[in-house]
Amino acid sequence: MAEAALEAVRRALQEFPAAARDLNVPRVVPYLDEPPSPLCFYRDWVCPNRPCIIRNALQHWPALQKWSLSYLRATVGSTEVSVAVTPDGYADAVRGDRFVMPAERRLPISHVLDVLEGRAQHPGVLYVQKQCSNLPTELPQLLSDIESHVPWASESLGKMPDAVNFWLGDASAVTSLHKDHYENLYCVVSGEKHFLLHPPSDRPFIPYNLYTPATYQLTEEGTFRVVDEEAMEKVPWIPLDPLAPDLTQYPSYSQAQALHCTVRAGEMLYLPALWFHHVQQSHGCIAVNFWYDMEYDLKYSYFQLMDTLTRATGLD
């Protein structure tokens, strides 16, 4: 009896993503030719938890014309910022039986630009990606080139963003598959970003494990070693690389259906809360994103229930 009930729950979880795709999940990420009104944004995108790419949302930003590598060098070249340094471009990712975070260095922007342009060398891959509102805290000189928030989104969501983040890196810098509890407005100023997306309803097919947290340390010889963070609790993370999934180890992932999209200069991606995303970029891409805290409403509760059942039934 208990085994039959457990199997019924497994079957329901496995069938749920297809039902969600038929009812609400888009097959491709749609484009809007202009920013929506606050009402339309909430009604058509936030409430149904659907992504979209918005054109002509940044045209009034001076940054769109100004921000080049040479402009950054002239404007903020001497400014030191937090830089993630990894041997392979993967910060905050599973490596073996560890969840490994990047080494962090305080480096002048000019040095990062020198490395990007091939004028200097630095061990590993550099990525300006500090996700704690690093734009206003570390690069306030650039704030006049953008907006401090997205007015129509702030009105729609009834709040200001929790964080405004600045991103700069080369094509080797990759963000591993994960999800956030934020309504994310991701704005590409120069270059392009490549997103692989999964809706929250794909959770039964996406594996999670618990990993010992660790950090890369950069040695004086320019090599990397992995050092455990013994004071931290284990971290739940996705071990799978969606670009080259090991379907022998994670066969259920073959049933997930990813959406792929490219966000180009001048475009804004609305990435809804709880959507899984994996991100790559063009060399020297410059971007800004706004994190608005999600509403912890019924959608969040339903996702937590699905997540708990997925783990309890052993699907992941």
UniProtKB/Swiss-Prot annotation:
Catalytically driven reaction(s): L-lysyl-[protein] + 2-oxoglutarate + O2 = (3S)-3-hydroxy-L-lysyl-[protein] + succinate + CO2
Question: What Pfam families does the record point to?
Answer: Cupin_8
The entry lists its GO molecular-function terms as: aminopeptidase activity; endopeptidase activity; metal ion binding; methylated histone binding; monooxygenase activity; peptidyl-lysine 3-dioxygenase activity
Per UniProt, the keywords (alphabetical) are:
Aminopeptidase, Cytoplasm, Disulfide bond, Hydrolase, Iron, Metal-binding, Monooxygenase, Nucleus, Oxidoreductase, Protease
Which residues make up the binding site for Fe cation?
A: H178, D180, H277
GO biological process, alphabetically ordered: proteolysis
Q: How is this protein organized at the quaternary level?
A: Homodimer; disulfide-linked. Interacts with DRG1 and DRG2.
Q: What is this protein called?
A: Bifunctional peptidase and (3S)-lysyl hydroxylase Jmjd7
